[in-house]
């Protein structure tokens, strides 16, 4: 297990200035936050520190500002939603460094919560500039990183600060790292991975890493067509990266060498147009008509996938099995998700899932809360699945050494 310090290692923090890196990169429409999930995830850390009397100073980025500050990317837009979720007053500052930040921090009382302005309004944030990092650190006594979703970036507020202040993992970061350790770090075996989505090209590193770590790899979604075509099967008009046939073959060779079973669809649900309620039928995967496209894996394939889930002690899931956004091509994803959720509830399976489409698919199936852990981290979750070291995590481990 990676070793890092958590809030449990913090004692007597009353009056201490705690810089907390959080992920507040939430969707906003017409000036209003439309989804507060990320705020809800960091609420326990913020409130725990506040209740212990710390001066809680929140650091976050929002969007991708191109040329310094812009009002439409100001965290002042997010502050009311943070207040609402926390049920606690949230102070704001017009900058994250300099006099504006320093005077706002100086005016804080014990237990106060202050949201500093968007760190990306300064180029030094993404450059991990040492002067900018020192300017951030000047307002804190302790650093807590609760933004696993930004841990794959070596930025000033995600990595740099841990070199200047005592560094700890927040509750969300801790939960994410402990769940990921159970998923791939030191999992109960057998381990089955489900990888879906449209393209092999975006997941080559992930697939190459997984075949060395899991006992079976289920491939679904559009990317399955690339593997099926690489075997010499006609996939009709299905989404397929024919130019990656050799890559697909190489992944299958690596899997065979590592003793990892590759599970590809045996049947598919085909249609001639990509729209909700399109006329469709189920065919054997070797009998796809030239004018049709596969939009979901078929019932025989779902049975095979569920049999692997039945055998598994650990399941890692990234990407839907079909075009789940439009019915009826959500059937396989929903069926497998519900089966995995049932095994998890019964205490037979540790299930870890992540990636934007995956979270949407599990919500669509109504089982996101029934998985052991569902990561909302996106890019950081994928890089972890690829076996890459995450700078924001590595620096916490180093700080605890």
Curated annotation (Swiss-Prot):
Binding site for substrate: 23-25, 38, 61-64, 120, 153
Entry-linked SUPFAM superfamilies: Phosphoglycerate kinase (SSF53748)
Organism encoding this protein: Rhizobium johnstonii (strain DSM 114642 / LMG 32736 / 3841)
Molecular function terms from GO: ADP binding; ATP binding; phosphoglycerate kinase activity
Location(s) in or outside the cell: Cytoplasm
Residues binding ATP, per UniProt: 203, 325, 355-358
A single BP term in Gene Ontology: glycolytic process
Subunit structure: Monomer.
Keyword RNA-binding in annotation: no
Main location class: cytoplasm
Catalysed reaction, written as an equation: (2R)-3-phosphoglycerate + ATP = (2R)-3-phospho-glyceroyl phosphate + ADP
Metabolic or biological pathway: Carbohydrate degradation; glycolysis; pyruvate from D-glyceraldehyde 3-phosphate: step 2/5
Keywords in alphabetical order: ATP-binding, Cytoplasm, Glycolysis, Kinase, Nucleotide-binding, Transferase
Enzyme Commission number(s): 2.7.2.3
GO cellular component: cytosol
Encoding gene, per UniProt annotation: pgk
Family of the protein in this entry: Belongs to the phosphoglycerate kinase family.
InterPro entries from the UniProt entry: Phosphoglycerate_kinase (IPR001576), Phosphoglycerate_kinase_CS (IPR015911), Phosphoglycerate_kinase_N (IPR015824), Phosphoglycerate_kinase_sf (IPR036043)
Name used for this protein in its record: Phosphoglycerate kinase
Domain of life the protein comes from: Bacteria
